[in-house]
């Protein structure tokens, strides 16, 4: 008989397998059952009903990707800070110290990016 500890991991394993298996099965069934009628018109880029006048593949400078990555990092930071701010009264001093360390780590990363002139556009 499995212990409670092993049973907890078994539930996580089942959810992990279902989380991987269900999308794979759904995508595979969709690919097998859909009608396939490829044409040149379907392969063109859609631009609001207008005939495309240039190639859709545009190269962006790497700094835009870095800037977008920094945005995502600080956007995720707000996702972590919001629940903490809502439950601040119940969490106590330990959570305050944890959040302080978290924000300081992000500020150190921001200072590093600023020092490396990642945020400078010119």
Curated annotation (Swiss-Prot):
GO terms for molecular function: NADH dehydrogenase (ubiquinone) activity; NADH:ubiquinone reductase (non-electrogenic) activity; quinone binding. This is NADH-quinone oxidoreductase subunit A. It comes from the Bacteria. The keyword Transmembrane applies. It comes from Bacillus cereus (strain ATCC 10987 / NRS 248). Belongs to the complex I subunit 3 family. Its EC number is 7.1.1.-. It is an enzyme of class 7 (translocase). Its main location: membrane.
């Amino acid at each position: 008989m499995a212990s409670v500890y092993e049973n907890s991991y078994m539930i996580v394993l089942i959810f992990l397998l279902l989380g991987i298996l269900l999308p794979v099965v759904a995508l595979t069934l969709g690919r097998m059952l859909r009608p396939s009628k490829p044409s040149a018109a379907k392969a063109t880029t859609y631009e609001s009903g207008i005939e495309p006048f240039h190639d859709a593949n545009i190269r962006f400078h790497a700094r835009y990707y870095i800037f977008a990555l920094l945005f995502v990092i600080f956007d995720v930071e707000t996702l972590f800070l919001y629940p903490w701010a809502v439950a601040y009264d119940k969490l106590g001093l330990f959570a305050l110290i944890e959040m302080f360390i978290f924000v300081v780590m992000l500020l150190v990363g921001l200072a590093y990016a600023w020092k490396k002139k990642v945020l400078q556009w010119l």
